[in-house]
Amino acid sequence: MKTLKDLGDLKGKRVLVRADFNVPLDGTTITDDGRIKAALPTIKTLREEGAKVILMAHLGRPKGKVVPELSLAPVAARLGELLGTNVPLAKDTYGEDAQAKVAAMNDGDVVLLENVRFNPEETSKDADERAAYAKKIAALGEAFVSDGFGVVHRAQGSNYDVAADLPAAAGLLVEKEVKALSKATENPERPFTVVLGGSKVSDKLGVIENLLDKANRLVIGGGMVFTFLKAKGYEVGTSLLEEDQLEKVKGYIETAEKNGVELVLPTDVVVNAGFPAGDTPVAPEVVAADAIPADKMGLDIGPESQKLFHDKIVDSKTVVWNGPMGVFEVPEFAAGTKAVAQGLVDATAAGAFTIVGGGDSASAVRNLGFPEDGFSHISTGGGASLEFLEGKELPGLKVLE
């Protein structure tokens, strides 16, 4: 994989950078700027080298139309604050305003192009259409840096096709992500523990399949665990259940046994009369995992399981965690996710290499107040880190070889 140093001297050069600025917004307020901060090392390095830094990114799913609420204006403002410099936002991605703003740049300046997904060609399935569009963007720059790890699993105009038109390299964030995830999957120090949560088993099938012959231990919580409990013959009440995955999950339980992989499931769960919505009062109670009442829904792992999961994580040299253990946004159902996060922090302090897979787990550790430096690596890619852990070839990385 080519990296920044492969691009040579960048002084005075116009460098297009595909970043991942797909941040959560409340109106125009950014509620978690983790992805913006993650892009700063690459931006600062390019500025120090005297490059003209042209940033591009997407926000939300405007589906090829201009949606004012999904403008990157809040991102430009936040970037300006973090960099201590003005970051102008072009009104378009490659049109007149983008061209004019780029033409006016001095060495070390930063410009942000408007949301790439305002253009239908960005995510087009037609390769020729995407390539023609990418050429228009590429005309703005003289080199391309791919630093949006959150989109490397997609072949899209601004991260895949542009790389074919310009000298291309991975930015510091993508390089760091690939190093960290490779360290965990290629030659992990053992015991190697994988902790999986989140609502759906179907989202994690590939990861389970790929890691069943690599991990020493698979720890499972979150909504997806009820399909495992059901596969073991337990009743799960009104908990989330993917009936169509039961046979697959039974197969995983058998394979784990055959491969000598320790499969750790909760022994107790926190249940409630239903999913906590709006202002409905919650009445959580703890029940054994094999005794969930017919009218109750499991929403977190119980106290006994919290200790069990924590101890299994601490007894590891490499830990990869993807997906919360419960509905962590509701305080009554956050303890499981906290216990796992604390387990990773304690394991890291004891010398283990720990990765928090992006998406919900990354937001959870930030929202629950854990220090970012308590973990070896917090990934910025949800789907991308999952596909990397599945052992898939990622198009946005392949073009940088």
From Swiss-Prot:
Q: Which top-rank group of organisms is this from?
A: Bacteria
Subcellular location per UniProt equals: Cytoplasm
Keyword Electron transport listed = no
Region forming the signal peptide: none
Any one GO CC term of the record: cytosol
Single GO term (MF) = ADP binding
Q: What is its main location?
A: cytoplasm
Pathway terms, separated by semicolons: Carbohydrate degradation; glycolysis; pyruvate from D-glyceraldehyde 3-phosphate: step 2/5
The enzyme class is: transferase
Enzyme Commission identifier(s): 2.7.2.3
List the InterPro entries hit by this protein, alphabetically: Phosphoglycerate_kinase, Phosphoglycerate_kinase_CS, Phosphoglycerate_kinase_N, Phosphoglycerate_kinase_sf
Q: Which residues bind substrate?
A: D20, F21, N22, R35, H58, L59, G60, R61, R117, R154
Which Gene3D superfamilies does this UniProt record tie to the protein?
Phosphoglycerate kinase, N-terminal domain
Q: Which residues bind ATP?
A: K204, G298, E329, G358, G359, D360, S361
Q: Does the keyword Kinase apply?
A: yes
Q: Which GO terms describe its biological process?
A: gluconeogenesis; glycolytic process
| UniProt catalytic activity | (2R)-3-phosphoglycerate + ATP = (2R)-3-phospho-glyceroyl phosphate + ADP
Q: Which UniProt keywords are listed?
A: ATP-binding, Cytoplasm, Glycolysis, Kinase, Nucleotide-binding, Transferase
Q: Quaternary state and partners of this protein?
A: Monomer.
Which family would the database say this protein is a member of? Belongs to the phosphoglycerate kinase family.
Protein name, please? Phosphoglycerate kinase
- The organism is Bifidobacterium longum subsp. infantis (strain ATCC 15697 / DSM 20088 / JCM 1222 / NCTC 11817 / S12)
The lineage is: Bacteria, Bacillati, Actinomycetota, Actinomycetes, Bifidobacteriales
